[in-house]
């Protein structure tokens, strides 16, 4: 997988890419610093080891002040993956990182819990029309509201293992918590009663339960996280 190059200053973008399209500048002004990664044609300053052998580079400008200071102390650029095992969800606390990676890393910088538990949205600007390669916190609708024509990558619908991924998280499954999932179907009252019974049984066994509900039924679940 290619790595994301993290910057802490907009002026750091130009030296590592061949060109910054106008639409990319618009997104940078709207969403940077923040959970948005953009892909450009790389300059000669970016080694192929960083890009996974591709001629493009993924760049992100994070909003966390501690991350920004780390990047600046490292010389203005940090090429790195997310702090989680491939296929696992993004951590939101230092404890999550320690539980997932353990002795595989030498140090954790604890900046407190983060507010967003999703990977950054990745938008490819190497094509004529911007393409979302990885969905994230910034939705397709939010991007289209700013730019107009933005498309979803066809590989998100039908992944092709033979295609070299242009961005992290495209090759393997993503957002995969270690949890059982049950879909309850049927008449509304029966669904509500069944879900409440499932949650009570889980809690009696010392488990935590989360419920995804509609606005019409959300008040009918007294237990669990709704």
Protein language model features and the residues they cover:
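Active-site-adjacent structural elements in enzyme catalytic cores
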Residues: 1-226
């Amino acid at each position: 997988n290619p790595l994301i190059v993290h910057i802490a200053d907009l002026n750091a973008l130009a030296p590592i890419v061949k060109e910054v399209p106008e639409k990319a500048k618009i997104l940078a002004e709207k969403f940077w610093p923040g959970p948005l990664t953009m892909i450009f044609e790389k300059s000669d300053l970016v080694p192929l080891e960083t890009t996974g052998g591709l001629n493009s580079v993924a760049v992100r400008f994070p909003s966390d002040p501690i991350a920004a200071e780390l990047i600046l102390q490292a010389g203005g650029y940090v090429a790195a993956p997310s702090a989680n095992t491939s296929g696992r969800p993004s951590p939101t606390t230092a404890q999550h990182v320690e539980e997932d990676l353990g002795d595989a890393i030498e140090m954790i910088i604890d900046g407190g819990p983060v507010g967003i538990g999703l990977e950054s949205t990745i938008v490819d600007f190497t094509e004529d029309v911007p393409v979302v390669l990885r969905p994230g916190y910034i939705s397709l609708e939010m991007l289209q509201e700013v730019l107009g024509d933005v498309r979803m990558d066809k590989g998100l619908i039908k992944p092709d293992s033979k295609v070299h991924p242009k961005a992290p998280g495209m090759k393997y499954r993503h957002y995969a918590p270690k949890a059982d999932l049950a879909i309850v179907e049927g008449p509304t009252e029966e669904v509500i009663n069944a879900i409440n019974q499932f949650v009570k049984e889980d809690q009696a066994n010392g488990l935590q339960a989360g419920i995804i509900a509609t606005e019409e039924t959300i008040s009918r679940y007294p237990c669990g996280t709704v």
